[in-house]
From Swiss-Prot:
GO BP terms, alphabetized: nitrogen utilization; uracil catabolic process
Enzyme Commission designation: 3.5.1.-
Keyword tags: Hydrolase
Gene3D superfamilies in alphabetical order: alpha/beta hydrolase
Protein's UniProt name: Putative carbamate hydrolase RutD
One MF annotation (Gene Ontology) recorded for this entry: hydrolase activity, acting on carbon-nitrogen (but not peptide) bonds, in linear amides
Catalytic activity: carbamate + 2 H(+) = NH4(+) + CO2
Domain AB hydrolase-1 residues, every copy: 14-119
Organism ancestry: Bacteria, Pseudomonadati, Pseudomonadota, Alphaproteobacteria, Hyphomicrobiales
Highest taxon of the lineage: Bacteria
Gene behind the chain: rutD
InterPro entries linked to this entry: AB_hydrolase, AB_hydrolase_1, AB_hydrolase_fold, Pyrimidine_utilisation_RutD
Organism: Agrobacterium fabrum (strain C58 / ATCC 33970) (Agrobacterium tumefaciens (strain C58))
Length: 261
């Protein structure tokens, strides 16, 4: 597993581990690394089958197998406790760890995640799979921003989107890996077990998320006993990228003691 450590290096530094969504890249968290660096040791990683980790996503194990990869990193760094932040699929990994190894996680942050996949999200993934299988990698990558960002934001960031498209095609994780990762997140269902998770959780959702209805986050906030809900009107699925200042402020309010915010 390829992982990187950023931020504080002192022995007393609290650690936060960041897990991205379907794309699996540690680069997803660049807007958060700067905001967190003064306060935390930050661990980012490329999911199995993606980026510098590479390899194949296993055929079995689903989200739990992805969580095991995180636990491998935790073991390598000798972490006894850490905060965990996950976006979408990454949030599912955090929920899995919170169920299996609750003492490891201090505070958990879930961004546009879910306890059970929504039928609308299923339709979106069906469309993306059909694009990949019938139109190829270029079409799949070019469509991806439509599910991530608000239209107004995309209109103002055309050069960035063009760079992201080129990078996404050049470093595509492979059809088999994409399909296995989508299958894993669609099969994930811990809805009946939310009450077992006693960790403090910040649930972040956006009303304009095209991919994951914000009602899935309402369900998380309802079912998780120690949750706080941050529901935003604008920002879409990748709100930590499109609204970084607003997101980072709320994130630090949740993670830091009151006298440090």
């Amino acid at each position: 597993m390829h992982f990187e450590v950023h931020g504080r290096t002192d022995a007393e530094a609290p650690t936060i581990l960041l897990s991205s969504g379907l794309g699996g890249s540690s680069a997803y968290w660049l807007p958060q690394i700067e905001a967190l660096s003064d306060h935390f040791r930050i661990v980012t990683y490329d999911h199995r089958g993606t980026g510098r980790t590479g390899g194949e996503v296993p055929t079995e194990g689903g989200i739990s197998a992805m969580a095991d990869d995180v636990l491998e990193i935790v073991s390598a760094l000798n972490l006894e406790k850490f905060h965990f932040m996950g976006h979408a699929l990454g949030g599912l990994i955090g929920l899995d760890i919170a169920l299996r190894q609750p003492r490891l996680i201090d505070r958990l942050v879930l961004i546009n995640a879910w306890s059970k996949a929504d039928p609308h999200s299923g339709r979106c993934f069906d469309v993306r799979i059909e694009l990949l299988e019938k139109s190829g990698v270029d079409a799949f990558v070019k469509a991806q921003p439509l599910f991530l960002y608000p239209a107004a934001w995309m209109s103002e960031h055309q050069e960035r989107l063009a760079r992201d498209d080129a990078h996404g095609v050049a470093h595509f994780q492979g059809k088999t890996n994409v399909l296995r990762r989508i299958a894993a997140l669609r099969a994930f269902d811990i809805d009946a077990r939310l009450g077992e998770i006693g960790n403090p959780v910040l649930v972040v959702a956006t009303k304009d998320d095209l991919l994951v209805p914000y009602t899935r986050s309402l369900r998380l906030a309802e079912g998780l006993p120690q949750s706080e809900l941050c529901l935003l009107d604008f920002g879409a699925h990748a709100v930590n990228i499109t609204e970084p200042d607003l997101f980072n402020t709320r994130l630090l309010q949740f993670l830091l003691p009151a006298d440090q915010t």
